[in-house]
Amino acid sequence: MSSALTTPDQMTLEEFLAWDAPGPGRWQLIDGVPVAMAPAGRAHGRLQAVIAGLIDSHLNATDSPCVALTNPGIVPAFQAGRNFFIPDVAVTCSEIDTDQAALHHPALVIEILSPSNHAETWRNIRAYMLIDSVREILVIYTASVRVDVLQRGANGSWPDDVTPITQGAFTLTSIGLNVPLGVLYRRSGVA
């Protein structure tokens, strides 16, 4: 029987977090509807592993109080009782409550953009921008060598336009890390 046939039509966040999801895999709650997430492809998985490793090594080397987590649950500020998103990586500099399903106070959120999840990913990114603690969002592309770095301005606003970075390196100012694109994309299969 398909998992689509066994999922409830609508759920609250509380019901979703208590729900025993059918089968393996990760689920998000989008506007009250549980949605199964597709397994990551090879390039997606490789890019996620590399960026998480680079960030973790940097945070440890600088004795930072911040922590990187892969696939953390995040409750957006808007319609919080009906949504639960799972970004690829997030960094928090706040204490982590291991009993909580959701990461509170993320400072940096990273999404890996595949052609098949473009609309969903950008919807989530717009929701992350409404979380007061989020200072920076990194979007990593799998169809080509490209990243977008979105940074909250000093006045709390986000940029209207993003300049794609397709060569050289980029800096995650929220944690003080410079990442060469060649290092990030090495062995990813993305050209």
Residue ranges and their predicted role:
Residues 1-191:
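Gly/Pro/Ser/Thr-rich low-complexity, intrinsically disordered segments predominantly at protein N-termini
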